[in-house]
């Protein structure tokens, strides 16, 4: 009743109440839209991050090559025409030729250095133009680090001077001829491997000396009277200090490796800028002068070092007698490695000698011509493609139209629309891609594949390995044995765009994964460690008898001193027999004895060990391991084997050995057939170590 009374009030008071009642109704709609948008972003974010990671991983350690796929055959630019004439011996000849060319290039080539200038912009310019210094003295030394001998504390170093040049100081970067710059050549004889066992590495040592300039007051450039200490130094000490080093001179040094200890060339053709380091003011002992690099403790950023100096710029070339060709590859800056396809007028201009530019153009012309030929031979398919992302059957986002055929997730250039759609469907199966025709190109609808099996289908061994194992793989590795069940493999149909159209409602099962890998992981029962793929065929609980264990057992039995030789032989055969078949229970001994007679019966008869074997059976009976029935069966079986051996010997043709030696088998058999009344005597003889007595009766 109260709401009705409140509703009968005046009209002006009713409108604000209606507006107040509508505001809470709009807020849930905006929150729901934002929540749906967040769910949309989360649904597409996880697969996108996964495919971005897989892209980086495939670049480092690819699982397969895209050019080998059927729908990417246009990416394979190689022809198999040379396979018909291919021979394995050609590989060795090719490698030897390449190795010989590299050695000849590295040794026979002369090292030519052309110095552009020495740049040092920290000092303030002098007011007197007459005393302005325009050059510095550069000394180039070839440092040879030799192998250390036993008596040497450190590796001996040999310094070979190659020459001195006057290098311009802070020259203006204007185009100039190469002849205007000082150049220096290092002969190839210095790098000859005549004493290669002595020299370990070769380095170039640059030593720049900048002489001090003095004005009319006798002060060096950049100094004033304020810099002089109040307490003047005595003339004698000042004279003594000036004798060690010229006052005002500055020395800058730098070192670069030419050949390392493995005789690999480290300096290629190109333009270099080396950061120099100033040596501290310290007295040098002329009797034992050695070159040292002493840091001043001031760490400058790299850009500040090369912008202010001191730096030395030079051009390095490996040349032969012909000055127009180079024998070593060119070390180009990083910024120009991918700029070969740009026109010449669009390339940034820089101060380079004409010879260096000619060499770079000659080396890169073949590669550039081949790239242009490959690109021009294939007509480019210009299509405007845009992607439309769907979530809950509603369009959430649409990308801008692109005129290329690159995959948005792995940036692979598919070059054809059919190849792009096939790649998206097979390599990015976490999404569903539907092709929609467009007059100017194509539209691809992207939605989440709800039927995708996101369980781990890779190698289960990788889960238990350390992080980063996938990137540290060096070559092929053995994987778990796998069996794929092919549900259906029909005849390959002709490529058609209709297979990428939107599927019907009854074809949802086609998005499901039909076959999966062997993702089971087994563990050792004794150590609980994962079973590796190479251990799948071997049972860890199976007690085998390796060769080393058999030899160890025989050696230990030979060391026994309280048994005779016959007992040792029976013990060896019995222990190896038990190890091979793995008898571990008492109820297995009856079967083990019969199996032992079948396997080792001929050896027992041949070595005349029948009585020793009888004692072994009696000993096992004393420990309740076998029964009397087993002893009777074993003895009967042994007699059958003995009679068979005798029959074979009678049928065999007589030999010289048969006349020289008596029939041992007959003697042993007659002795074995003695009555049980003599068993005690036999036992006493065997224990005492005496050989068994043979019967004098011989069979006719």
Curated annotation (Swiss-Prot):
- Tell me which InterPro entries the record gives: Polycomb_protein_VEFS-Box
Annotated region described as Disordered, given as residue ranges = 215-250, 319-376, 651-700
Q: Per the record, which residues fall in region VEFS-box?
A: 520-596
Per the record's keyword annotation, is Flavoprotein included, yes or no? no
Biased-composition ranges, Polar residues, are: 218-228, 664-674
One Pfam match, given by its short name, reads VEFS-Box
> Which CDD domains does the annotation name?
C2_II_SUZ12, VEFS-box_SUZ12, ZnB-Zn_SUZ12
Cell compartments where the protein resides:
Nucleus
Zn-finger segments (C2H2-type): 405-428
Keywords in alphabetical order: Chromatin regulator, Metal-binding, Nucleus, Repressor, Transcription, Transcription regulation, Zinc, Zinc-finger
List the GO terms this entry assigns under cellular component, sorted alphabetically: ESC/E(Z) complex
The Gene Ontology biological process terms listed for this entry are:
chromatin organization
Q: What GO molecular-function term can you cite, just one?
A: zinc ion binding
Q: Which domain of life is it from?
A: Eukaryota
Please state the protein's primary subcellular location. nucleus
Q: What does this protein do?
A: Polycomb group (PcG) protein. Component of the prc2/eed-ezh2 complex, which methylates 'Lys-9' (H3K9me) and 'Lys-27' (H3K27me) of histone H3, leading to transcriptional repression of the affected target gene.
What is the annotated quaternary arrangement, including any partners?
Component of the prc2/eed-ezh2 complex.
The UniProt similarity line reads: Belongs to the VEFS (VRN2-EMF2-FIS2-SU(Z)12) family.
> What protein is this chain from?
Polycomb protein suz12
The coding gene here is suz12
């Amino acid at each position: 009743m109260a709401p009705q009374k409140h509703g009968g009030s005046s009209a002006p008071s009713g409108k604000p109440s209606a507006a107040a009642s509508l505001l809470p109704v709009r807020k849930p709609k905006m929150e729901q839209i934002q929540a749906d948008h967040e769910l949309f972003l989360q649904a597409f974010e996880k697969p996108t991050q996964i495919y971005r990671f897989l892209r980086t991983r495939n670049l480092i350690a690819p699982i397969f090559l895209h050019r080998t796929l059927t729908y990417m055959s246009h990416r394979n630019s190689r022809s198999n025409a040379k396979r018909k004439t291919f021979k394995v011996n050609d590989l060795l000849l090719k490698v030897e030729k390449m190795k010989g060319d590299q050695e000849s290039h590295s040794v026979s080539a002369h090292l030519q250095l052309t110095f552009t200038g020495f740049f040092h912009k920290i000092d303030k310019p002098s007011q007197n133009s007459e005393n302005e210094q325009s050059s510095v003295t550069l000394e180039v030394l070839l440092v040879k680090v030799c192998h250390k001998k036993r008596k040497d504390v450190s590796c001996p170093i040999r310094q070979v001077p190659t020459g001195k040049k006057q290098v311009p100081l802070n020259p203006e970067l204007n185009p100039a001829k190469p002849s205007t710059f000082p150049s220096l050549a290092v002969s190839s004889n210095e790098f000859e491997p005549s004493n290669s066992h002595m020299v370990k590495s070769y380095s170039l040592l640059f030593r720049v000396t900048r002489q001090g300039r003095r004005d009319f007051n006798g002060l060096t450039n950049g100094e004033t009277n304020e810099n002089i200490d109040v307490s003047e130094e005595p003339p004698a000490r000042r004279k003594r200090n000036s004798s060690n080093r010229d006052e005002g001179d500055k020395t800058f040094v730098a070192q670069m490796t030419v050949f390392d200890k493995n005789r690999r060339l480290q300096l290629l053709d190109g333009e270099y800028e080396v950061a120099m380091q100033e040596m501290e003011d310290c007295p040098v002992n002329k009797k034992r002068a050695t070159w040292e690099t002493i840091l001043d403790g001031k760490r400058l950023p790299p850009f500040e070092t090369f912008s202010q100096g001191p730096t030395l710029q030079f051009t390095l070339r490996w040349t032969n007698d012909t000055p127009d060709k180079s024998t070593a590859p060119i070390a180009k800056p990083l910024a120009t490695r991918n700029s070969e396809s740009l026109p010449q007028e669009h390339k940034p201009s820089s101060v380079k000698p004409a010879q260096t530019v000619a060499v770079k153009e000659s080396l890169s012309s073949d590669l550039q011509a081949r790239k242009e030929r490959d690109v021009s031979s294939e007509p480019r398919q210009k299509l405007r493609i845009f992607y439309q992302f769907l979530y809950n059957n509603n369009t959430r986002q649409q990308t801008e139209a692109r005129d290329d055929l690159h995959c948005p997730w792995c940036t692979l250039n598919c070059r054809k629309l059919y190849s792009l759609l096939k790649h998206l469907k097979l390599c990015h199966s976490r999404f569903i891609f539907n092709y929609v025709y467009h007059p100017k190109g194509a539209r691809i609808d992207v939605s989440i594949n709800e039927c995708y099996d996101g369980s781990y289908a890779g190698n289960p061994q990788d889960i238990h390995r350390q992080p980063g194992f996938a990137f540290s793989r060096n070559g092929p590795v053995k994987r778990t044995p796998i069996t794929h069940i092919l549900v259906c493999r029909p005849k390959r149909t002709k490529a058609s765009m209709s297979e990428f159209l939107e599927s019907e409602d009854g074809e949802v099962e086609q998005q499901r994964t039909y076959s999966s890998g062997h993702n089971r992981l087994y563990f050792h029962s004794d150590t609980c460690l994962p079973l590796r793929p190479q251990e799948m065929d071997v049972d860890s609980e199976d007690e085998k008898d390796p060769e080393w264990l058999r030899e160890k057992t025989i050696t230990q039995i030979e060391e026994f001193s309280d048994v005779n030789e016959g007992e040792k032989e029976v013990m060896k055969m019995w222990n190896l027999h038990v190890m091979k078949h793995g008898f571990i229970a008492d109820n297995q001994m009856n079967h083990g004895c019969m199996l032992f007679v079948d396997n080792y019966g001929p050896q027992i008869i041949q070595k005349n060990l029948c009585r020793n074997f009888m004692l072994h059976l009696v000993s096992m009976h004393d420990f309740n391991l076998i029964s009397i029935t087993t002893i009777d069966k074993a003895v009967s079986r042994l007699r059958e084997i003995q009679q068979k051996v005798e029959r074979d010997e009678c049928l065999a043709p007589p030999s010289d050995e048969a006349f020289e030696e008596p029939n041992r088998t007959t003697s042993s058999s007659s002795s074995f057939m003695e009555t049980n009344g003599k068993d005690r005597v036999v036992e006493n003889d065997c224990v005492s170590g005496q050989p068994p007595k043979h019967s004098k009766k011989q069979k006719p």
